[in-house]
């Protein structure tokens, strides 16, 4: 059974409903993080040094998408990112993965057209400029920053089907 590492958004958490959706696809590991603590990102990064990541995937929403993307870049693992805060990568955040890595694993982005916090167009430009591996970009026209369970379920299902085909 594959491990699914889920990273929530800033001041967020994985809801019970979304956890149940992900449990259909594997073993869900989703601690709650305090991203306000400057050491949190370093602790997350260091916690993966010794892990066996065979068959693992990274999933994140908003700021958790930034973290999940960082880890998937370092370890070349598939990632599913909902409204990821990718533009934070341009700030000094303690995560120094190269932006232009050529990955073999899929990066699957779900962006809300109605997101008022993270502009989907900025994310699309960033993704097309910097991501060199296989990417899939989905624009959900009715989605804002928060991801409704039905969209989360549909896109998780699509993502896991795509990585199963590889």
Identify the meaning behind each predicted range:
Residues 9-10, 31-36, 77-89, 112-114:
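Active-site nucleophile loop of the alpha/beta-hydrolase fold
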Residues 59-68:
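Gly/Ala-rich beta-loop-alpha elbow adjacent to hydrolase catalytic centers
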Residues 31-33, 136-144:
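Short glycine-rich catalytic loops that host catalytic nucleophiles or stabilize transition states
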Residues 12-13, 113-119, 145-146:
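Acidic catalytic loop of the alpha/beta-hydrolase fold
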Residues 1-53:
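Active-site catalytic motif of lipid deacylating hydrolases and related acyltransferases
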Residues 102-104, 109-115:
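Short beta-strand/loop motif that positions the catalytic acidic residue
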Residues 18-19, 94, 119-129, 152:
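Short alpha-helix in the alpha/beta-hydrolase fold that links the catalytic acid
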Residues 142-153:
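Catalytic histidine-centered segment of alpha/beta-hydrolase-like enzymes
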């Amino acid at each position: 059974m594959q491990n699914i590492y889920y990273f929530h958004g800033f001041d967020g958490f994985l809801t019970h409903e979304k956890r149940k959706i992900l449990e259909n696809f594997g073993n869900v590991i989703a601690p709650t993080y305090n991203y306000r603590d400057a050491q949190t990102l370093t602790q997350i990064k260091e916690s993966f040094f010794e892990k066996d990541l065979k068959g693992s995937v990274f999933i994140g929403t908003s700021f958790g998408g930034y973290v999940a993307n960082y880890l998937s870049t370092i370890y070349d693992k598939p990632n599913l990112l909902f409204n990821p805060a990718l533009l934070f990568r341009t700030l000094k955040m303690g995560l120094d993965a190269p932006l232009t890595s050529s990955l073999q694993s899929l990066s699957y982005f779900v962006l809300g057209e109605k997101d008022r916090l993270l502009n989907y167009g900025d994310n699309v430009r960033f993704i097309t400029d910097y991501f060199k591996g296989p990417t899939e970009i989905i624009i959900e026209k009715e989605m804002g920053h928060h991801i409704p369970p039905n969209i989360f379920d549909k896109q998780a299902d699509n993502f896991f089907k795509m990585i199963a085909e590889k």
